[in-house]
Amino acid sequence: MATPLFFTDNAVAKVRELIEEEENPDLKLRVFVTGGGCSGFQYGFSFDESQEEDDTVIERDGVKLLVDSMSYQYLVGATIDYQEGLQGSQFVVQNPNASSTCGCGSSFSI
């Protein structure tokens, strides 16, 4: 079986904080890949209450991360992190499958 995604402590803590702010314990973080961006593919993040039949679920410390089957093939082995810096705060994907990424890090190519 392929190596699943890794969900860092920072990402888990931020997702938990956002779910608590929304006061909806059914929310899960969905990570997906779409076509676009300057390198061909880009990452997307959203909160979702529903889990689809073909979703891969990564659960850590009570927080769930969902990935649809199409996106999963591009994200196998990736690390989902949350970083705060001078240029703002954001979820970041460290993807070993990406052959190149754009300068902003939000799009990639295989």
Curated annotation (Swiss-Prot):
Keywords: Iron, Iron-sulfur, Metal-binding. One of its GO terms (molecular function) is 4 iron, 4 sulfur cluster binding. Iron-sulfur cluster binds at residues 38, 102, 104. InterPro entries: FeS_biogenesis, FeS_cluster_insertion, FeS_cluster_insertion_CS, FeS_cluster_insertion_RrpA, HesB-like_dom_sf. Its cofactor is iron-sulfur cluster. The keyword Metal-binding applies. GO terms for biological process: iron-sulfur cluster assembly. Binds 1 iron-sulfur cluster per subunit. Required for insertion of 4Fe-4S clusters for at least IspG. NCBIfam families: iron-sulfur cluster assembly accessory protein, PRK13623.1. HAMAP family: Fe_S_insert_ErpA (MF_01380). Belongs to the HesB/IscA family. Homodimer. This is Iron-sulfur cluster insertion protein ErpA. It comes from Marinobacter nauticus (strain ATCC 700491 / DSM 11845 / VT8) (Marinobacter aquaeolei). The lineage of its organism: Bacteria, Pseudomonadati, Pseudomonadota, Gammaproteobacteria, Pseudomonadales. The gene is erpA.
